[in-house]
Amino acid sequence: MAAQGFLLIASFLLILLVLAKPLGSGLARLIAAVPLPGVAGVERILWRTLGITDHEMNWRQYLLALLTLNLLGLGILFCLLFWQEWLPLNPQRLPGLSWDLALNTAVSFVTNTNWQAYSGESTLSYFSQMAGLTVQNFLSAATGIAVVFALIRAFTRQNVHTLGNAWQDLVRITLWILFPVALIIALFFIQQGVPQNLSAYQPITTLEGAKQLLPMGPVASQEAIKMLGTNGGGFFNANSSHPFENPTALTNLAQMLAIFLIPAALCFAFGEAAGDRRQGRALLWAMSFIFVVCVAVVMWAEVQGNPHLLAAGADSSVNMEGKETRFGVLASSLFAVVTTAASCGAVNAMHDSFTALGGMVPMWLMQIGEVVFGGVGSGLYGMLLFVLLAVFIAGLMIGRTPEYLGKKIDVREMKMTALAILVTPMLVLLGSALAMMTDAGRSAMLNPGPHGFSEVLYAVSSAANNNGSAFAGLSANSPFWNCLLAFCMFVGRFGVIIPVMAIAGSLVSKKVQPASQGTLATHGALFIGLLIGTVLLVGALTFIPALALGPVAEHFSLP
């Protein structure tokens, strides 16, 4: 089993790196605002048609453009969901959503979280899925990538005040990166058996003679961008464990690769844009180390078997509860770590049925800020925040003003870094405390004791860090939970983006200082270790008390 797990991890990472490197070169061209080959003429026509100028924006203008797009999308999506019954492509005649569920869902998809307090096949029409959710899957992913583009330019430019044109970046990211790659993935899914139609649900008779209604819909197109954009919201309630979303072992592998593809490619793009590929590789090494350790822990925990079944004398050599037999324990464990290391949230197994330690690792990966590869764009700018913190700590130890890529890190940058890093932990801890203190929060818990608390902690961690996965033993479709999690999702997304853009605005105007003998090398093994230690230290200090009350207590209470 250990050899199989090692081979699975190694194969996955090898294929990922082979695919990510050329995509990273394309992303680096977009960061430098250089059109991809053959599209310059098309872009000129687009700019004239859409009224987009070549005028570059400072950080406030860039941020305002992104906020305007997202708030407009939030309002439109809310209206689509609320008045769904009056809109076309609704063959099942599904009613509109309640105001609180429509708000929660709109915020969820605009913030790239894709938390779902509903069952897709029994709640949403095809029009809502296509014109509402799928559109936001593209736009929310493009927003995250645009933010990291601006931050990378802040490190590579000097003595200027502009970070690029947000509208041009959004169009280029969507048309030249997200759409073509998603199209290729969607066609592969269709070939593997994922439905792509607008047919009404199909009544069938099973082999046992029972009547059943099979849901249909444009699944493949949404599934592709759901994974590529690290969105994670499933067309069906069972998400990627549903055979219509993830029918084969090949689609399972493709989905995991799609989740990590752009986050890994952005590391390569960062190195190319910075003029030193070692900088991008250092971040990739740090992310990969944490990722591999986490996968190993989850695989080990899940192959130990279910303690309750073992105590009852049952044959439980591995913990198969909540897992699909077509994937097995190892692939399900790998998928769980991939989807929570990135801010995807798609699942091919029930995380609530993992062992206590097996479920704790995905929860902790979310709590440290989704920086182990992370979401498209958000993972890299989240890790760069930890880079600035690590550089600052190193500067304190050696008595030098901290620098990164030749840019001095001053008080303003560190204040914004601290604010951005602390936003999500505050939301998680305060939100969980509020839920446990109120009757409305506790009434949603379907399990008592440490596991019930773990379900609450997981839900708020998932929302605040824009992941979207869940321990499903929580009845979250209530006004209290819909509003609480919508608030956590919105602040967790834009409460980090705003200080990140402020950091970019401050750094871009600074001069690049030449390296000296005392300059800390940020591409070697020493700095990689310091960066990993910084991530682990912040995660440990912040969440160990909460984790001790949940999964750790549950683990020690097992038979």
Swiss-Prot record:
Bridged cysteine pairs (disulfide): none
Protein keywords: Cell inner membrane, Cell membrane, Ion transport, Membrane, Potassium, Potassium transport, Transmembrane, Transmembrane helix, Transport
Claim: Transmembrane helix is one of the keywords in the record: yes
GO cellular component, one term: plasma membrane
Bilayer-crossing regions: 5-25, 27-47, 63-83, 132-152, 170-190, 253-273, 283-303, 327-347, 356-376, 379-399, 416-436, 484-504, 524-544
Gene Ontology molecular function: P-type potassium transmembrane transporter activity; potassium ion binding
Annotated membrane topology: Multi-pass membrane protein
Pfam families xref list: KdpA (PF03814)
Organism superkingdom: Bacteria
Cellular location(s): Cell inner membrane
Family named by the database record: Belongs to the KdpA family.
Function: Part of the high-affinity ATP-driven potassium transport (or Kdp) system, which catalyzes the hydrolysis of ATP coupled with the electrogenic transport of potassium into the cytoplasm. This subunit binds the periplasmic potassium ions and delivers the ions to the membrane domain of KdpB through an intramembrane tunnel.
Quaternary structure and partners: The system is composed of three essential subunits: KdpA, KdpB and KdpC.
Protein name: Potassium-transporting ATPase potassium-binding subunit
Organism in which the protein naturally occurs: Salmonella paratyphi B (strain ATCC BAA-1250 / SPB7)
Lineage: Bacteria, Pseudomonadati, Pseudomonadota, Gammaproteobacteria, Enterobacterales
Gene name tied to this protein: kdpA
